[in-house]
A protein has these predicted regions:
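An acidic, low-aromatic, low-complexity terminal/linker signal
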Residues: 1-159
Length: 159
């Protein structure tokens, strides 16, 4: 293996949602944890079904399966805790997965203009072509209506 080829290889975590596999850059993964109690409460954030408590943090649970496969998950094997970026800030988000996760090294092909915004690129692994997910586009953020609502709430809360 040449030095130039080694530089192009990146680490990815393969995750299973139903029958399909997806990939996330390993740099975005904090940990993989067993399912725990999801605390549900009234809120206005779409795609967030509740929160879990992990290592002293409140971590939002975001089931992205419906956006990716067209079906909501009925069972969960693990939560993949990923790092979501909001501008200059970061936050953990828990993604429910239905099967084992796998760490692989591979060369990612960049997404094209015709690809959906949640696709960061593509991997070829074991004869399959796998979507590499752009979590910033797939999970809810502080942009648009949510950002305006949060800013309005922050201004109203000031003395």
């Amino acid at each position: 293996m040449t030095a130039s080829l080694e530089l192009e290889l990146q680490s990815f975590v393969l995750l299973r949602l139903g029958e399909r596999r997806f990939a996330v850059s390993a740099r975005q993964i904090a940990e993989l944890v067993a399912p725990s109690s999801v605390f549900r409460f009234p809120h206005h954030t779409p795609k967030i079904e509740g929160v879990i408590l992990r290592r002293g943090r409140i971590v939002p649970v975001c089931d992205v399966s419906e956006a990716l496969t067209g079906e909501r998950l009925t069972s969960r094997r693990f939560y993949l805790i990923a790092v979501r970026r909001y501008g200059a800030q970061t936050e953990w988000v828990a993604l429910p997965v239905t099967g084992e996760c796998e760490l692989i090294n591979g060369e990612m092909t960049a997404a094209g203009e015709a690809d959906a915004p949640h696709v960061a690129g593509w991997l070829s692994h074991d004869g399959d072509v796998i979507e590499v997910l752009n979590l910033d586009a797939l999970t809810p953020g502080t942009d648009g209506v949510l950002g305006e609502r949060a800013a309005r709430g922050a201004l109203e809360a000031r003395p």
